[in-house]
A protein has these predicted regions:
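Transmembrane helical bundles of ABC transporter permease domains
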Residues: 1-4
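ABC-type nucleotide-binding domain
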Residues: 6-210
Length: 210
């Protein structure tokens, strides 16, 4: 489904005769893809398991390179961007979230204590619906993650980890938002919460929801 919402800061995405074949495989996973997501649009993509949806996401994130054709962001081929500059355009939320054994605040800001905006971190945790739990921790947002790895560290449930990753996406404010089956392992209540957060998170951005 499509919802058009052209806003400043959003980017356009074009798949131009794009294909991808995994090394050692004779059969392409994706072949001759041609479609455009206009700046500010919100696209939902559905398909059977094994149809290549996650491969498409990895291509768009720059983790894989197309074996044919190209992908353009705002008319510019992904390969023509500096890596750091390109990664700055994307916020992503995946099904299997890997949190770092750092503090909650550092996970949200993707940075060190010296360059983070602590007020923004807390606001993003509130938007993601996680602050109420974190506020009960003695060290609040300074609590370390990685229970069993660090002293006084805590563990988060699958749903809570998804919320933390969403807070990270809120914090980054990248113009392109990608969610790859973020609700696949969640119960119906947590799934509904993710959809509600997605609406907030995708405001003013181009977004792709798998």
């Amino acid at each position: 489904g499509r919802k058009k919402e052209k806003k400043q800061g959003a980017v356009s995405v074009e798949f131009c005769h794009t294909g991808f074949t995994y090394p050692g495989s004779e059969k392409p996973t994706l072949q001759n893809l041609n479609f455009t997501i206009r700046a500010g649009e919100k696209i939902a993509m559905v398909g059977l398991n094994g149809a290549g949806k996650t491969t498409l996401v990895k291509l768009l994130c720059g983790l894989y390179k197309p074996t044919e054709g190209e992908i353009r962001i705002d008319g510019k081929a992904i390969g023509d961007y500096e890596k750091e500059s390109y990664y700055g355009l994307i916020s992503s939320v995946f099904q299997n979230v890997q949190l770092l054994p750092l503090t909650i605040a550092e996970n949200v800001s993707s940075g060190t204590k010296e360059n983070m905006d602590r007020e923004k971190v807390i606001n993003c945790l509130k938007l993601a619906g996680l602050w109420e739990k974190i506020e009960d921790f003695p060290d609040k947002e300074n609590t370390s993650l990685g229970k069993g790895i660090q002293k006084n560290a805590v563990g988060l449930s699958g749903g809570e980890q998804q919320k933390l990753w969403m807070a990270r996406a809120f914090y980054k404010e990248a113009p392109l938002l990608i969610l790859d089956e973020p609700t696949a392992a969640l119960d119906p209540l947590a799934e509904q919460e993710v959809y509600e957060k997605y609406v907030r998170m995708s405001e003013g951005r181009t977004s792709l929801f798998i």
